[in-house]
Amino acid sequence: MRLHHVQVACPPGGEDAVRAFYADTLGLVEVDKPEPLRGRGGAWFRAHDATGEVVAELHVGVEDPFVPARKAHPAFVVDDEAALDRVVSRLRDAGHDAVDTERFTFPGYVRVHTVDPHGNRVELLAPSG
């Protein structure tokens, strides 16, 4: 068994903001939703490793009423601390906070937390050492 995707939500009309955040800022690749699901709104994204293999998929669905996920969250692993620092720089350049007060609290990784434009928590990790 393996994980196929994680889903978070956005409010109606929030797709452009999630595209800017997950694709432009974090570097995920938007993929087309299957035709039968397109009418629901939202957006789907994939993360790839250095070989091009899909290693994570994030689905953003529309919810009304919308409540952001403050505790439950996707956690994306980047290659190394330098890559994490580059993502943090892109986040901050785009006006997003990147909180690193728990940077050294997860054994084997360094990490930061941020929130997407709709308040959903997102974790970014890199192998330490």
Listing of model-derived features with the role each one plays in the protein:
Residues 61-65, 127-129:
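Acetyl-CoA-dependent GNAT
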Residues 9-55:
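Core segments of cupin and vicinal oxygen chelate
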Residues 20-24, 87-92:
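Short amphipathic alpha-helices in soluble, non-transmembrane regions
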Residues 35-38, 64-66, 103-107:
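A short beta-turn/loop motif at secondary-structure boundaries
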Residues 51-58, 119-121:
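Short, charged/polar, Gly/Pro-enriched secondary-structure boundary elements
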Residues 3-12, 43-48, 65-90, 94-129:
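Vicinal oxygen chelate
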